[in-house]
């Protein structure tokens, strides 16, 4: 075989070998991905009110090579069931856990007992009980902002009805207490109503108290209030916290006067990022408070508010 023919045969083989080496061993994003991390997410409820937060979590999981497993109490907002779920995940040696606490007092012992398991709470801060980190918002500022918004529609001495829809020690209650303090300081009458989805009982409260405004402090209660207000011309002005598609539609139609739209997509993303870095013993410098904005019908289509109301991945 001539040297020329030999070179014609060997050179392509060398080229293919080099190409294979580049594809198999050259630096690239997929070759620098960390090992897959399993992460359990213990929710407060199973409806669509955490959908945007869940999208944020799923986007972070995709970016950071994390596999999420969502766990939901059979009864919405059951701290007792959350304790059981948390203890089960810890005993099963879950590498990392996200928890949206329903009640700090009920969950405190289980959180403290989590030990070496990476545990990050979302919405309600439990670092004082031993959680590794918390992704939350300034609940006092949020509650005060809602109270201030409601004051615009309620004259001095007028009554504002606050919905207590999530009993227990949690971030949602912090919002309610902050709104109550501000409204009372500014001369408004405040009534607190324990919301139980009983529309008949609520209608009686409206008839007796005759509030000028109602404030809901989490998305589930605000969604139900918006539905109750449908077609009711005499319904009080409605304010609340939440930014689901249903709430945005109610705001657009005027059934909700103003909302505190929280960047829950960002909260979900940051929670997974924090837990992943801590579980992998990577550097994590903490996260700033999750932002929110008071949004009215006339401001809902500004570019900044669009990102809060209609987050996209």
What are these regions (language model features)?
Residues 99-115, 194-248:
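Hydrophobic alpha-helical
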Residues 266, 270-313:
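Hinge/cleft segment of the Venus flytrap/periplasmic-binding protein
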Residues 104-141, 244-252:
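Flexible loop/hinge segments that line or gate small-molecule binding clefts
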Residues 25-53, 132-133, 159-167:
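Short beta-strand segments enriched in small/hydrophobic residues
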Residues 38-56, 60, 69-79, 102-104:
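Extracytoplasmic "Venus flytrap"
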Residues 134-159, 243-247, 262-280:
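Hydrophobic alpha-helical segments within soluble ligand-binding/sensing domains
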Residues 49-64, 142-146, 170-189, 224, ...:
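Short, solvent-exposed amphipathic alpha-helices that sit
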Residues 8-24:
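Hydrophobic membrane-insertion alpha-helices, especially the h-region
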């Amino acid at each position: 075989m001539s040297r020329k023919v030999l070179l014609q045969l060997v050179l392509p083989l060398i080229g293919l070998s080099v190409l294979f080496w580049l594809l198999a061993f050259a630096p690239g994003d997929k070759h620098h991905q960390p090992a897959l991390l399993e992460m359990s997410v213990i929710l407060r409820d199973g409806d669509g009110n955490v959908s945007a937060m869940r999208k944020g979590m799923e986007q972070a999981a995709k970016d950071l090579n994390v596999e999420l497993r969502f766990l939901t109490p059979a009864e919405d907002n059951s701290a007792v069931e959350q304790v059981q779920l948390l203890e089960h995940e810890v005993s099963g040696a879950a590498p990392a856990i996200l928890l949206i606490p329903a009640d700090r007092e009920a969950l405190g012992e289980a959180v403290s007992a989590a030990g070496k398991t990476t545990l990050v709470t979302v919405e309600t801060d439990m670092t004082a009980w031993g959680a590794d980190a918390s992704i939350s918002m300034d609940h006092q500022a949020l509650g005060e902002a809602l109270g201030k918004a409601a004051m615009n529609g309620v004259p001095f001495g007028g009554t504002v009805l606050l919905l207590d829809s999530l009993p227990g020690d949690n971030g949602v209650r912090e919002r309610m207490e902050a709104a109550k303090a501000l409204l009372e300081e500014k001369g408004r009458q405040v009534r607190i109503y324990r919301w139980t989805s009983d529309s008949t009982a609520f209608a009686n409260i409206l008839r007796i108290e005759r509030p000028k405004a109602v404030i809901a402090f989490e998305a589930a209660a605000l969604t139900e209030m918006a539905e109750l207000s449908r077609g009711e011309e005499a319904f009080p002005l409605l304010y609340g916290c939440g930014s689901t598609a249903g709430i945005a539609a109610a705001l657009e139609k005027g059934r909700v006067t103003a909302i505190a739209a929280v960047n829950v997509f960002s909260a979900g993303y940051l929670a997974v990022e924090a837990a992943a870095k801590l579980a992998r013993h990577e550097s994590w410098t903490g996260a700033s408070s999750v932002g929110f904005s008071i949004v009215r019908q006339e401001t809902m289509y500004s570019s900044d508010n669009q990102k809060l109301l209609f987050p996209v991945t």
